Design a protein with these regions (language model features):
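Structural motif
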Residues: 21, 60-64, 133, 217-219, ...
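Conserved catalytic-core segment of NTP-binding enzymes
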Residues: 232-337
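Short gly/pro/ser/thr-enriched loop/turn and capping motifs at secondary-structure boundaries
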Residues: 88-90, 111-113, 171, 277-280, ...
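Walker A/P-loop phosphate-binding motif and the immediately C-terminal alpha-helix
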Residues: 130-177, 239-240
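Conserved Rossmann-like nucleotide-cofactor binding loop
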Residues: 27-28, 169, 254, 278
């Protein structure tokens, strides 16, 4: 049965900074407490003037218009939002200036925006992850293998990395990584996800793969769930991107609504094309669909043999930037059967290609603790 991930407060470690709610209006207080609960946090509710210490340390300050006057003398700080009570009261804008509020909000119209703003404050969101979609120009082009290798290479560098299996008919990327028995959620568990998904909760819920300490993989299982709704793909990818680092999505050639959503959230797409005439013709049709959703589409050429088409001609014919040529990986078929993750062998064609590509698109992303171990 599909189970949506819901946000809740993290356990263990230091207590995260909590939002501060300042209002004596009971309906407004109840509404704000419900929104905070949906964002995974338990705010402090104060009905009078707040202590200065709480004002300064709160992750976000939500001030009801009925308490704006009580707070006007507090020191200026970022993250103050004023909740208006009367749409016809023009004085709320004057009080917002006196308070130093960043925004004036009216509920319920601003509820979705406020939910995201609270969750961002609680999670401490930084720059979003670079998101790369990988898909094949024809069947069997090796897109899934390249997607796994990109994620493995990033994890070996200590980057926070999330690999997302966007192909429900691909058999499961966890098998390619040798992690099909690893405990954790798969796509059928998340098919009901809607709205805001906590990035921290998602990272904890996904399988932790042996030897790949910073790599989390959201894979399909071997069940009979045919697809996930685009809303679930949107929510899960948004959560994965909020943590920074790299997100890699393996996208099917036939773009269902969820795959289309994955492309729209990506920064770059890599189209893997064997250097064969029919493969290039097929890739041209795939590329037309991809370009409708994403501007930065690059071709990765796989030479099938000495008589294949030159890579630069393929790129020119597809009207794409050439990301590079991916030579055959010796022993790859045996490695995959034995559960050896693609790209794990340093110095191999996969690792070299992925390293060069990551140097180009992620030149300044810092590593996190815990790489390959």
């Amino acid at each position: 049965m599909s189970k949506p991930i819901t946000d809740h407060a993290a356990t263990g470690g230091p207590e995260p900074a909590r939002p501060l709610v300042l209002t004596g209006n009971d309906p407004l207080a109840e509404h704000l407490l419900r929104i905070c609960a949906a964002a995974g946090t338990d705010p402090r509710l104060i009905r009078g003037a707040p202590p200065r210490e709480l004002w300064e340390e709160a992750s976000l300050v939500l001030v009801g218009d009925d308490r704006a006057g009580h707070c006007a003398a507090m020191p200026r700080r970022p993250g103050v939002l004023l909740l208006g009570l009367d749409l016809d009261d023009a004085g709320v804008w004057v009080r917002a200036v006196q308070l130093g509020a960043e925004h004036v909000l009216f509920l319920p119209d601003a509820e979705t925006w406020l939910l995201d703003r609270i969750a961002d404050a609680v999670e401490g969101v930084g720059p979003p992850a670079r998101t790369v979609a990988v898909l094949g120009g024809r069947g069997g082009a090796g897109a899934s293998t390249l997607a796994c290798a990109l994620a493995v290479t990033a994890a070996r560098r200590g980057l926070r990395t999330v690999l997302v299996d966007g192909d429900p008919l691909g058999g499961g990327l966890d098998i390619l990584l040798g992690g099909e028995t690893a405990a954790g959620l798969r796509w059928p568990d998340l098919a009901g996800s809607r709205g805001r998904v906590s990035g921290a909760e998602l990272a904890r819920a996904l399988p932790a793969l042996k030897r790949l300490g910073t790599l989390a993989c959201l894979s399909w299982d071997r069940g009979d769930t045919p697809a996930v709704p685009p809303e679930a793909m949107r929510s899960v990818l948004a959560a994965a991107r909020r943590g920074g680092g790299l997100v890699v999505v393996d996208v099917p050639r036939r773009l269902d609504p969820a795959a289309g959503q994955a492309l729209e959230q990506s920064d770059t797409a890599l189209l893997v094309v064997p250097a064969e005439l029919r493969a290039v013709a097929a890739a041209d049709r795939v590329a037309a669909s991809v370009r409708m959703r994403l501007d930065d589409v690059r071709v990765v050429v796989r030479p099938p043999g000495p008589f294949g088409l030159p890579a630069h001609r393929i790129a020119r014919g597809l009207r794409m930037q050439l990301a590079g040529v991916l030579d055959p990986e010796p022993g790859l078929a045996v490695d995959l059967e034995q559960g050896v993750p693609p790209g794990i062998r340093e110095g191999g064609p996969l690792a070299r290609f992925c390293g060069a590509f990551l140097d180009e698109v992620l030149p300044t992303v810092p590593a996190v603790e815990g790489g390959v171990y």
